[in-house]
Amino acid sequence: MRVFAVFLAACLMAGCASKPDYYISPAPVTIPKTATYWLDTFDVEVVGKNERFLPDDKVRQQLGVDLVDRLLKAKRYAASKDKADYLLDVNVIYTRRIQDTQGGFMTAIVDDKTILASVDFNYQVKVKKAGAEVLHFSQARQGLMPGGYKGDWQNMKTMAGVLTNSGNSSVETFYTGLLSRFIVDDLRDIPSR
């Protein structure tokens, strides 16, 4: 019975520590850790529209600029499409979770639809070479909220927005300036054989 319990515990720990799934083509794939990428297509769908927050085009632009900037800083972005080792097709669904008490008790404190409570950041990345897909991966990151010392500052601004009933529309630039790091981290974690 103890052996079974240890085996079960090991299986649970292995599942919790797993990385994203990488779907690789039938032919063996080798992607060096120094490979460079070029952003071929970048599509963003924004869910949860609200005039208080950034327009869809601005969200799309900020996420794309942040992704390219992070790849440049990691020395993984090519100088041109022709010089890139791999091309990337990125599809993003950016979902705002906007507070709505539907006339509940909180409405007496802060107006509905003025507080961005969290965001969902879901994405699929296809890595291509010579026009053919080499691999793809996807992630669904739900309920993301500001964290760390910069996030604590954003949370304080949100609390001030609640107390003054002015909302927290400024927190969205915090999200759009950080979320692309998840994609870059996943690209960095692609196994090289």
Show where each model-derived region lies.
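Short, well-structured beta-strand/strand-turn elements
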Residues: 73-83
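Surface-exposed short loop/turn segments
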Residues: 82-150
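C-terminal/domain-edge helix-coil "capping" segments
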Residues: 17-29, 126-193
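Flexible, solvent-exposed loop segments that connect beta-strands
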Residues: 46-55, 103-111, 152-161
